[in-house]
């Protein structure tokens, strides 16, 4: 493991065109729930699965239910960027990181200072 970590550090120090691809694992340290873990949103009981509730069609047909789910499960008051968010922002400021591509829609990358963030 130490060898792998050292290799990653070397790659980062030598690189100038890093693109970070991330997902829920980055923000779980900030208290944001994920979808697939044991405690994730997929394992909680709702009338619909999360991917249905978060669809455009569901929003059009059931706006009250959509906003209730969003408010209750996706907005985490007090969530702050964690060490990963902050380190990625620092790499961008250093000119090493070109972009963050993420499945997260929590805004924590931007709150940490990242400018080029693509939320999928």
Residues covered by each model-derived region:
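Conserved catalytic core of sirtuin-type NAD+-dependent deacylases
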Residues: 1-120
């Amino acid at each position: 493991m130490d060898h792998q970590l050292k290799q990653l550090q070397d790659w980062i120090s030598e690189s100038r065109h890093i693109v970070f691809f991330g997902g829920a694992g980055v923000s779980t340290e900030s208290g944001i729930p994920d979808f697939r873990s044991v405690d994730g949103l997929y394992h909680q009981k709702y009338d619909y699965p999360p991917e249905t509730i978060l669809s455009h069609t569901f929003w059009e047909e059931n706006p009250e239910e959509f906003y209730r789910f969003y408010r209750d499960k996706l907005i985490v008051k007090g969530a702050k960027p964690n060490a990963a968010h902050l380190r990625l922002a620092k790499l961008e400021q250093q000119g090493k990181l070109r972009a963050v591509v993420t499945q997260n829609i929590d805004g924590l990358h931007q709150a940490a200072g990242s400018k080029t963030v693509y939320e999928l």
